[in-house]
From Swiss-Prot:
Its main location: cytoplasm. The keyword Lipoprotein does not apply. GO terms for biological process: nucleotide-excision repair; SOS response. A motif (Beta-hairpin) lies at residues 112-135. Forms a heterotetramer with UvrA during the search for lesions. Interacts with UvrC in an incision complex. This is UvrABC system protein B. SMART domains: DEXDc (SM00487), HELICc (SM00490). It is found in: Cytoplasm. InterPro entries: Helicase/UvrB_N, Helicase_ATP-bd, Helicase_C-like, P-loop_NTPase, UVR_dom, UVR_dom_sf, UvrB, UvrB_inter. It comes from Burkholderia mallei (strain ATCC 23344).
Length: 696
């Protein structure tokens, strides 16, 4: 069990855990399902049990779709994989599922590259670009933890991005390489070391870190690749495993004695020695054929280039069992025929697993597009002798291949696209929100006076301490509008595509805190913009047909005001297009259904009160009060500190902030930054950023 979810938290209310017959999941239910949730859950569970391959959960923003997914998974008791369209959304889902399943294996499988430049060749300029990348250690560990959980247990929920349809090592070979140690096993020190090296662990006596081991006499310490804060000590006596202990690699303190331990390979690309030798032979055969082809065509430069590069890789494979760019030879290792799909994370899933595609209208497009882009780049590398043709088989899955590997699927979206509507056996509607909030009122106004009209609407909203989102069609329009509003005294920011994830999170946070009141953007469909304080969404030039003014985009954008009791959407247009008509009709239909439900149940809509720290919706946190109390105590503590102590505390917070950022916990990082600002203000009388300017 990997330690990032084995911490069964003590502060959870035992009575809130729910279990279902025959299911290994323990669902933490802070509140019972309400609104449309119970029917949606029952429909989906029944559909899966009846053997439906595809179903859709049509859930509006703020209706608690994640909660419905968690309930469905818990009731079915099968391993599940939840796909998200990007890392930010995946991180959000991962955090939510960990809240719902604190005692089960919730895993995270996204691309481990912080930065990635694939190798490529530009023939026009004779320019070869080497592969260059920086791997995020922490995410690599979580990926290894995900495949390990799938092999060991059934109560697994994996949150993944499209990264899951890219090739990784073959599951059966990965399985063959596992080393299980039990007390009393007959195994010598040299054999343990040989097995570890075959699994791509490195021996390192000085720097003991993930994926390394160290030897002291008959004691071997192993730092498993899928763990972040736990290592295992194997003590041998007379070629037999005497004892096994788990210990803290940082302090060396022994945690517990254990009867057995399974060491998993340190990479998904490990292969048994005989497979490597077999691959070396088939690579040589392919190289010979390819060189003959180049010589026949008189392409001598390409032939020489290919031979030099491949021979070097072959030597590395024979000596070490792996080489740089080993994934380009994956077909030779798996023994697959040319053109066959590569093994991916999907192959590690058991046959009865459940697949949930969140924001499926975006995901299906992504899954469709991955293969073509990859293919175009690799064909150049092959044609010009940088790679063997078999490199073309190290690729993401084509969509039809992914379809063949799909298990039972639930598409989740507020606006399902044509594909989902075509293949779904049934659709579960989740239109009613547990909070009683209804979809915003829609008004269409003339586009000719849109800018002045928006300004007067903003003034009203600012008085009521509410926020406004405005979506326009072009960068130029966005810049001009931002400038115009700023000149009229409106606190406004412009959100454009060049802003990175961390800064986006900060801008959204500042909007919620009221640092500014209006956010102008072009594409407001991106994640994280479900902001309860927003009571008005203005769509300028709503009648210009195009991707951002299509029916689905309009419904999604209008939905951005659905978390506020006074939510309203203004569409500025001189004529009503078909897309507008359909979007307005659908929103009105949902609104009518919601109002009818509220009247029947006697519910008064209440706004969502979200702590500013959460981008994560729908999870009520009992530690809210505790956090506020702690903050007040912190402030009091700072008052009593000497300057030296404060300097120390600043150092500590800076490190903490960097750690949070490294672990992709941008929200916490931003919070720590606010604490730092508080402290610096105490010392310097003003928050001077990161440096102190020389005063007198």
């Amino acid at each position: 069990m990997s330690e990032h979810h084995s911490d069964t938290r003590d502060d959870l209310d035992e009575s809130k855990f729910v279990t279902f017959e025959g299911s290994p999941f323990q669902l933490y239910q802070p509140y019972p399902p309400s609104g449309d949730q119970p029917t949606a859950i029952a429909t989906l569970v029944e559909g899966v049990e009846d053997g439906l391959s595809f179903q859709t959960l049509l859930g509006v923003t703020g209706s608690g779709k994640t909660y419905t997914m968690a309930n469905t998974i818990a009731r079915l008791g099968r391993p599940a994989i939840v796909f998200a369209p990007n890392k930010t959304l995946a991180a959000q889902l991962y955090a939510e599922f960990r809240e719902f399943f604190p005692r089960n294996a919730v895993e995270y499988f996204v691309s481990y590259y912080d930065y990635y430049q694939p190798e490529a060749y530009v023939p026009q300029r004779d320019l070869f670009i080497e592969k260059d990348s920086s791997i995020n250690e922490h995410i690599e560990q979580m990926r290894l933890s995900a495949t390990k959980s799938l092999m060991e247990r059934r109560d697994v929920v994996i949150v993944a991005t499209v990264s899951a349809i890219y090739g990784i090592g073959n599951p059966s070979e990965y399985h063959q390489m596992i080393l299980t140690l039990r007390t009393g096993d007959k195994i010598g020190q040299r054999e343990v070391i040989a097995r570890l090296i075959a699994m791509q662990y490195t021996r390192n006596e000085q720097d003991f870190q993930r994926g390394t081991f160290r030897v002291r006499g008959d004691t071997i310490d192993i730092f498993p690749a899928e763990h972040a804060e736990m290592a295992v000590r194997v003590e041998l006596f007379d070629d037999e495993v005497d004892t096994l202990h788990l210990f803290d690699p940082l302090t060396g303190r022994v945690r517990q004695k254990i009867p057995r331990f399974t060491v998993y390979p340190s990479s998904h690309y490990v292969t048994p020695r005989e497979t490597v030798m077999r691959a070396v032979e088939t690579i040589k055969d392919e190289l010979r054929e390819r060189l003959e082809f180049f010589h026949r065509d008189g392409k001598l430069v390409e032939a020489q280039r290919l031979e030099q590069r491949t021979r070097f890789d072959l030597e590395m494979l024979q000596e070490l069992g792996f080489c740089k760019g080993i994934e380009n030879y994956s077909r030779h290792f798996s023994g697959a025929a040319p053109g066959e799909p590569p093994p991916t994370l999907v192959d590690y899933l058991p046959p009865d697993a459940l697949m949930l595609l969140d924001e499926s209208h975006v995901l299906i497009g992504q899954l469709n597009g991955m293969y073509n882009g990859d293919r175009a780049r690799k064909e150049n590398l092959v044609d010009y002798g940088f790679r063997l043709p078999s490199a073309l088989d190290n690729r993401p899955l084509k969509f039809p291949e992914f379809e063949r590997k799909m298990r039972q699927v639930v598409f989740v979206s507020a606006t399902p696209a044509d594909y989902e509507q075509r293949v779904s056996g049934q659709t579960a509607e989740q239109v009613v929100r547990p909070t009683g909030l209804v979809d915003p009122q829609i008004e269409v106004r003339p586009a000719s006076t849109q800018v002045d009209d928006v300004l007067s609407e903003i003034t009203e909203r600012v008085k009521a301490n509410e926020r406004v989102l405005i979506t326009v069609l072009t960068k130029r329009m966005a810049e001009q509008l931002t400038e115009f509003l700023a000149d009229h005294g409106v606190k406004v920011r412009y959100l454009h595509s060049d802003i990175d994830t961390v800064e986006r999170v900060e801008i959204i946070r500042d909007l919620r805190l009221g640092t500014f009141d209006v956010l102008v953007g072009i594409n407001l469909l991106r994640e994280g913009l479900d902001i309860p304080e927003v009571s008005l969404v203005a769509i300028l030039d709503a009648d210009k047909e195009g991707f951002l003014r299509a029916e689905r985009s309009l419904i999604q954008t209008i939905g951005r005001a659905a978390r506020n009791v006074n939510g309203k959407a203004l569409l500025y247009a001189d004529r009503i297009t078909d897309s507008m008509r359909r979007a307005i009709d659908e929103t009105e239909r949902r609104r009518a259904k919601q109002i009818a439900y509220n009247e029947k149940m006697g519910i008064t809509p209440r706004g969502v009160v979200k702590r500013i720290k959460d981008i994560i919706d729908g999870v009520y946190n009992a530690d809210e009060a505790r956090a506020e109390l702690k903050e007040a105590q912190q402030r009091a503590k700072f008052e009593d500190m000497s300057e030296k102590q404060i300097a120390k505390e600043i150092k500590r917070l800076e490190k903490q902030m960097a750690d949070y950022a490294k672990n992709l916990e941008f929200e916490k990082a931003a919070q720590t930054r606010d604490q730092l600002a508080l402290l610096r203000e105490r010392v310097f009388g003003a928050n001077v950023g990161d440096h102190v300017s020389g005063g007198e």
